[in-house]
């Protein structure tokens, strides 16, 4: 009878260790699968953005986005007004 006392506790401890390690391994596997799915989605998003960037060409310069209506006859008649120049405005404003 004394033979079973030690082996009973040892058996339940082994079961806890076995099930605990299996559970931990399962959680790690689940984590790897979730990270893989997120990485695939991120990769597809990057490829789509790269494809859209290639289709649209280079990004337009901010000055070209202003779309100021100026006809070609106005350009030839227009004299450069230095009072609107940034350096001129910066010099005339007190600091």
UniProtKB/Swiss-Prot annotation:
The modification Phosphoserine is found at residue 64. It comes from the Eukaryota. The keyword Transmembrane applies. Keywords: Cell shape, Immunity, Membrane, Phosphoprotein, Transmembrane, Transmembrane helix. It is a single-pass membrane protein. It is found in: Membrane. One of its GO terms (biological process) is cell morphogenesis. The chain crosses the membrane at residues 22-42. The keyword Acetylation does not apply. Pfam families: LST1 (PF05083). Expressed in spleen and at lower levels in thymus and liver. InterPro entries: Leukocyte-sp_tscrpt_1_LST1. GO terms for cellular component: cytoplasm; membrane. Possible role in modulating immune responses. Has an inhibitory effect on lymphocyte proliferation. Induces morphological changes including production of filopodia and microspikes when overexpressed in a variety of cell types and may be involved in dendritic cell maturation. Belongs to the LST1 family. PANTHER family: LEUKOCYTE-SPECIFIC TRANSCRIPT 1 PROTEIN. This is Leukocyte-specific transcript 1 protein. The lineage of its organism: Eukaryota, Metazoa, Chordata, Craniata, Vertebrata.
């Amino acid at each position: 009878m004394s033979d079973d006392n030690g082996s009973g506790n040892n058996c339940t401890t082994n079961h806890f260790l076995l099930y605990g390690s299996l559970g931990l391994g399962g959680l790690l596997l689940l984590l790897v699968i979730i990270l893989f799915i997120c990485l695939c989605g991120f990769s597809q998003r990057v490829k789509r953005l790269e494809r859209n960037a290639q289709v649209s060409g280079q990004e337009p310069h901010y000055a070209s986005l202003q779309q100021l209506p100026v006809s070609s006859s106005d350009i030839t008649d227009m004299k450069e007004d230095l009072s609107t120049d940034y350096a001129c405005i910066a010099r005339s404003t007190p600091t």
